[in-house]
């Protein structure tokens, strides 16, 4: 599901809400998650999961086109860990 599809589904489930309000709400939630991660803080949504940053060590990679070694710097990457409720609901599928 894309962000656009999520917005369309929420609009269909809540016809009394203005489309712009739903769209702004989804965008605001995602923006706040990103801003919190930029500050190296963790975002926890109980039952759903948590977003955090994981550190990746510097390493030597390979250019897939040429096969040449490339030095990759250390970096932080976003990480999502599913919560208990989400894991249980997905396991039923």
UniProtKB/Swiss-Prot annotation:
One Pfam family linked to the record: Bac_DNA_binding
Name under which the protein is recorded: Integration host factor subunit beta
Protein family: Belongs to the bacterial histone-like protein family.
GO molecular function terms attached to this record: DNA binding; structural constituent of chromatin
InterPro entries referenced in this protein's UniProt entry, alphabetically: Hist_DNA-bd (IPR000119), Histone-like_DNA-bd_CS (IPR020816), IHF-like_DNA-bd_dom_sf (IPR010992), IHF_beta (IPR005685)
Example GO BP: regulation of DNA-templated transcription
Source organism: Haemophilus ducreyi (strain 35000HP / ATCC 700724)
GO cellular component: chromosome; cytosol
Subunit structure: Heterodimer of an alpha and a beta chain.
Protein role: This protein is one of the two subunits of integration host factor, a specific DNA-binding protein that functions in genetic recombination as well as in transcriptional and translational control.
Keyword annotations of the record: DNA recombination, DNA-binding, Transcription, Transcription regulation, Translation regulation
Lineage summary: Bacteria, Pseudomonadati, Pseudomonadota, Gammaproteobacteria, Pasteurellales
